[in-house]
Swiss-Prot record:
Remaining remarks: In contrast to CACNA2D1 and CACNA2D2, it does not bind gabapentin, an antiepileptic drug.
UniProt-listed SMART domains: VWA
Posttranslational mods: N-glycosylated.
Localization annotation: Membrane
Domain notes: The MIDAS-like motif in the VWFA domain binds divalent metal cations and is required to promote trafficking of the alpha-1 (CACNA1) subunit to the plasma membrane by an integrin-like switch.
Protein name: Voltage-dependent calcium channel subunit alpha-2/delta-3
CDD domains named among the record's database cross-references: PDC2_MCP_like, vWA_VGCC_like
Pfam families attached to this UniProt entry: VGCC_alpha2, VWA_3, VWA_N
Originating organism: Mus musculus (Mouse)
Length: 1091
């Protein structure tokens, strides 16, 4: 029997053995986690897969055949370096001529309108049945046409996107809050009827014209061609032509404005609500050439934005919205000291004028108050008399008229205007009065300035909603001119009759640009006198949240926000100043929804477009982008090869102008070219140089059709139907497509279709597969898959493409790109087959992708996963899956991080929102809100109630709640690019309790890398690397500096601030426009009955 000592020894021995075993186990773990993945084996896998997949891609794309065919013509082509300056000057001249045609059409409308008005005598009893755009073709319950709604023939027209229109007549829209048969409107409609024949004549002269119109100062809107207008779901048409930018810009000159708002105690409640709405309506009338500030006053002065104390700010969309947010914070208390406010306003206007930064034209003070106890003539005598350069516009808020005389005197003594605003319904009409006063000098001068708006999307018009393209609503600019009264007896009054205009879609500009001469990455762009983008391929005016919506600041995106690498604004400022020249810089251009980046050097060439406020620029990328070549084949040869059914041309490129004659509008570009070459349509105008190159490409690429057909017929060549599509595109926009499977069997049904904008030739870019192939080494293929493919079954494809160069040098133009699309499953199967190979004679591999200790990936040159054992990771960024390895690759220089900026981003923000609808937007809620208000404000109701104030009331408590909204913001985000010179890398990562090894090996002749990672060491202490954008948040002082900062801009060339003959006695009265009760009740009643 063993004693205690023996037991103790035995216990110690067991413990020692256990400790030894644990030590060996731990050492085993360390050894296993530090085991080196054999580079030679990974290199073998990469070589096997690379050879196999390139063989498939080259074979099915026909790349070698096409390269050979172009080489055969090498001696017969002439290579030219593109002269960027000459190109941009030529383009500017073409655009100048196009713009001039549009402005001449508008000028003819001006002459006709003024002549018609001169001959017309106002008749207060005039009875005239006109075509009301809302009522046309409407019948009553007995089947009779409604009054003003007689029969108006409408027919679909392909030039207007098959909208039903009447190209013989215009019709008239009257705002909902105005009386259709008001004598002023009936007389205006009557004499403006003579514009019909000019509308038709303009359209005959220039069939590319779209909407032509006359916006009357009385509020009605005459539009050609005539179209049916449909009210919104509340029975309302909110459109009023007088608050559109084109109207305001044409009617007035640039202005500096200080808005003074009385926030004394007497302004509480309804009055303050009306005052806020009045300020908001004034802001609506200010444009990018105007400057403003808002000051509130009681015993003290309060700048609505304290940061902008003592200065004015440009009235762009961002700044106006910033001030609107501050308006909601206003409250009334104390006593109003107007003298202090007036002194401050005059000093600001004087000081700002001396800086030379403002409009240097008209100046005005807008006073919004419920009364003034004095006329403050000593202040006006000190600052404004005798010249009266600052106009005073006074808005009396409320029904009380005790102090109306003082306010009216101020306005009349300072060439301004006085109005009284009793209800919210009065605001819009009364605010518009000041525009007509400011237009007087221009009218007396009889200066018909041509104005062009910035790019905008006018979704308030029903036809704009329907004239949408695949990308959303159409971006356009408007050319407009004012129409004046020429009657002698009204000359000194300077009566503005209205504004005429026509819209010019931005895509019309793009049609004039020869994309084939700009190279694969080249593009043209244009900006306004304020530096805002008119057209640029990087402009993104829409965002998606359920449906496509306009970004709030889309029309004021500055050139510096898309060409952000130009930190000193050298390019922008030169273009704003209408200079002609050249500028170069390295740029980082994103492709594929912004997730990939191409780093290149661009040469920019720029000049002005005469007769407009626009400047034009052209960007050419260095290297192959600066060269162009001319081939030569006979028309007979080329025409024969264009007849093949697999040939298509870029629909958005302008080979022939099919807009000039109505009979050509139905033609595709390919059909137009064929008719042109056959001489069957002598009226067709075509780009001879481009067509010659199209014929050359058609001839050279023709043999590939027979090649693809032979592959398709030999079913054994593609027995598992892995390869589905072969395609090619040339520098002239010519495409050929071949299907190796039936159309219904295609995995990606959208590929190369019209809706697949990224992968087809567009007005402003080459297909994505073409652009990426051009940046690859000649002879290699670029492979890609849609992002997050693992979650989207229909897109489980791999696209492979390669470029075709004419010469074996960097200066060679990239003449074409060819490629294939194959099933992702087929592609991945080839990868896994290759990764099972090994060089061991006994066939026993030291390592395999099937091993649990390793993870194998196939990633591209931007770090996106094409193959992973976890299928759901397909299309994800490698750094999100293997953060530690990606971090090491960045440290070692195998990949580099490139920081990018997005100044057009939309970020989520929490905002207070009201449950109360405003005005006519929701009659039912307006009714309930009004009822509550009537009960709680009975006394005020008895004194001030009328139908307008009842209709528009949301006077009292608004239920506030936090709501997530998308708002414009600036973001920063990374993109990643592999270092081409590094072909292979091995590495070890020291983690907390283990070491993680990996091997990365480039796949030959591709943009791909095989990455094999030791999976036994998780290395969870290293965070994933994400590509998610981060909002750039600015502190208060920086926000203030950004608000104050004003980029260089060019003022409009004309200014009509004053005229000595102006009759200042027309300065307003105390009456306010009352809307008709029945008219206002109609939408409410119909809304209530429909519920």
């Amino acid at each position: 029997m063993a004693g205690p000592g023996s037991l103790c020894c035995a216990s110690r021995g067991a413990s020692a053995l256990l400790a030894t075993a644990l030590l060996y186990a731990a050492l085993g773990d360390v050894v296993r986690s530090e085991q080196q993945i054999p580079l030679s084996v990974v290199k073998l896998w990469a070589s096997a897969f690379g050879g196999e997949i390139k063989s498939i891609a080259a074979k099915y794309s026909g790349s070698q055949l096409l390269q050979k065919k172009y080489k055969e013509y090498e001696k017969d082509v002439a290579i030219e370096e593109i002269d960027g300056l000459q190109l941009v000057k030529k383009l500017a001249k073409i655009m100048e001529e196009m713009f001039h045609k549009k402005s001449e059409a508008v000028r003819r409308l001006v002459e006709a309108a003024e002549e018609a008005h001169l001959k017309h005598e106002f008749d207060a009893d005039l009875q005239y049945e006109y075509f009301n755009a809302v009522l046309i073709n409407e019948r009553d319950k007995d089947g009779n046409f409604l009054e003003l709604g007689k029969e108006f023939i409408l027919a679909p027209n392909d030039h207007f996107n098959n909208l039903p229109v009447n190209i013989s007549l215009s019709d008239v829209q009257v705002p909902t809050n105005m009386y259709n048969k008001d004598p002023a409107i009936v007389n205006g409609v009557y004499w403006s009827e003579s514009l019909n024949k000019v509308f038709v004549d303009n359209f005959d002269r220039d069939p590319s014209l779209i909407w032509q119109y006359f916006g009357s100062a009385k509020g009605f809107f005459r539009q050609y061609p005539g179209i049916k207008w449909e009210p919104d779901e509340n029975g309302v048409i909110a459109f009023d032509c007088r608050n559109r930018k084109w109207y305001i810009q044409a009617a007035t000159s640039p202005k500096d404005v200080v808005i003074l708002v009385d926030v004394s105690g007497s302004m509480k409640g309804l009055r303050l609500t009306i005052a806020k709405q009045t300020v908001s309506s004034i802001l609506d009338t200010l444009g990018d050439d105007d400057f403003f500030n808002i000051i509130t006053y009681n015993e003290e002065l309060h700048y609505v934005e304290p940061c902008l104390n003592g200065t004015l700010v440009q009235a762009d969309r961002t700044n106006k919205e910033h001030f609107r947010e501050h308006l909601d914070k206003l409250f009334a208390k104390g006593i109003g000291m107007l003298d202090i406010a007036l002194n401050e306003a005059f000093n600001i206007l004087s000081d700002f004028n001396h800086t030379g930064q403002g409009s240097i034209c008209s100046q005005a003070i807008m006073l919004i108050t419920d009364g003034a106890v004095d006329t403050y003539d000593t202040i006006f005598a000190k600052y404004n008399w005798p010249d009266r350069k600052v106009r005073i516009f006074t808005y009396l808020i409320g029904r009380e008229a005790a102090f109306a005389d003082n306010l009216k005197w101020m306005a009349c003594a300072n060439k301004g205007f006085f109005t009284q605003i009793s209800t919210l319904a009065d605001v819009q009409e009364n605010v518009m009065e000041y525009l007509h006063v400011l237009s007087r000098p221009k009218v007396i001068d009889q200066e018909h300035d041509v104005v062009w708006t910035e790019a905008y999307i006018d979704s308030t018009l029903p036809q704009a909603q329907k004239l949408a393209d695949d990308q959303g609503l159409v971006l356009m600019t408007t050319v407009a001119m004012p129409v004046f009264s020429k009657q002698n007896e009204t000359r000194s009054k300077g009566i503005l009759l209205g504004v005429v205009g026509t819209d010019v879609p931005v895509k019309e500009l793009l049609k004039t640009i020869p994309k084939y001469k700009l190279g694969i990455h080249g593009y043209a762009f244009a900006i306004t006198n304020n530096g805002y983008i008119l057209t640029h391929p990087e402009l993104r005016p829409l965002y998606e949240e359920g449906k496509k919506r306009r970004k709030p600041n889309y029309s004021s995106v500055d050139l510096s926000e898309v060409e952000w690498e130009d930190r000193d604004d050298v390019l922008r400022n030169a273009m704003v100043n209408r200079k002609t020249g050249k500028f170069s810089m390295e740029v980082k251009k994103t492709v594929d929804k912004g997730k990939r980046v191409l780093v290149m050097t661009n040469d920019y060439y720029y000049t002005d477009i005469k007769g407009t406020p626009f400047s034009l620029g052209v960007a050419l990328s260095r290297g192959h982008g600066k060269y162009f070549f001319r081939g030569n084949v006979t028309i007979e040869e080329g025409l024969h090869d264009l007849e093949h059914p697999d040939v298509s041309l870029a629909d958005e490129w302008s080979y022939c102008n099919t807009d000039l004659h109505p009979e050509h509008r139905h033609l595709s570009q390919l059909e137009a070219i064929k008719l042109y070459l056959k001489g069957k349509e002598p009226l067709l105008q075509c780009d001879k140089e481009l067509i010659q190159e199209v014929l050359f490409d058609a001839v050279v690429s023709a043999p590939i059709e027979a090649y693809w057909t032979s592959l398709a017929l030999n079913k054994s060549e593609n027995s598992d139907k892995g390869v589905e599509v072969a395609f090619l595109g040339t520098r002239t926009g010519l495409s050929r497509i071949n299907l190796f499977v039936g159309a219904e069997q295609l995995t990606n049904q959208d590929f190369l279709k019209a809706g697949d904008k990224e992968n087809i030739f567009n007005a402003d870019h080459f297909p994505l597969w073409y652009r990426r192939a051009a940046e690859q080494i000649a002879g290699s293929f670029v492979y890609s898959i849609p992002f997050s493919t693992g979650t989207v079954n229909k897109s489980n494809v791999v696209t492979a493409s390669t470029s075709i160069q004419l010469l074996d040098e960097r200066k060679s133009p990239v003449v074409a790109a060819v490629g294939i699309q194959m099933k992702l499953e087929f592609f991945q199967r080839k990868f896994w087959t290759a990764s099972r190979q090994c060089a061991s004679l006994d066939g026993k591999c030291s390592i395999s992708c099937d091993d649990e200790t390793v993870n194998c990936y196939l990633i591209d040159n931007n770090g996106f996963i094409l193959v992973s054992e976890d299928y759901t990771q397909t299309g994800d960024f490698f750094g999100e899956v293997e953060g530690a390895v990606m971090n090491k690759l960045l440290t070692m220089g195998s990949f580099k991080r490139i920081t990018l900026y997005d100044y057009q981003a939309m970020c989520r923000a929490n905002k207070e929102s009201s449950d109360s609808a405003h005005g006519l937007l929701d009659p039912y809620k307006a009714f309930l809100s009004a009822a509550k208000w009537i009960m709680t404000e009975l006394v005020l109701f008895l004194v001030e109630f009328n139908l307008c104030s009842w209709w528009h009331s949301d006077m009292t408590a608004k239920a506030q709640k936090l709501k997530q909204t998308l708002e414009p913001c600036d973001t920063e985000y990374p993109a990643f690019v592999s270092e081409r010179t590094i072909k292979e890398t091995t590495g070890n990562i020291a983690c907390e309790d283990c070491s993680k090894s990996f091997v990365i090996q480039q796949i030959p002749s591709s943009n791909l890398f095989m990455v094999v990672v030791d999976s036994s060491c998780l290395c969870e202490s290293v965070a994933p690397i994400t590509m998610a954008p981060i909002e750039i948040r600015y502190n208060e002082s920086l926000k203030c500096e950004r608000l104050k900062a004003q980029k260089i801009r060019r003022r409009p060339e004309s200014c009509h601030g004053f005229h000595p003959e102006e009759n200042a006695r027309e300065c307003g009265g105390a009456s306010s426009l009352q809307a008709q009760a029945a008219l206002l009740l109609l939408p409410l009643v119909s809304s209530l009955f429909s519920r």
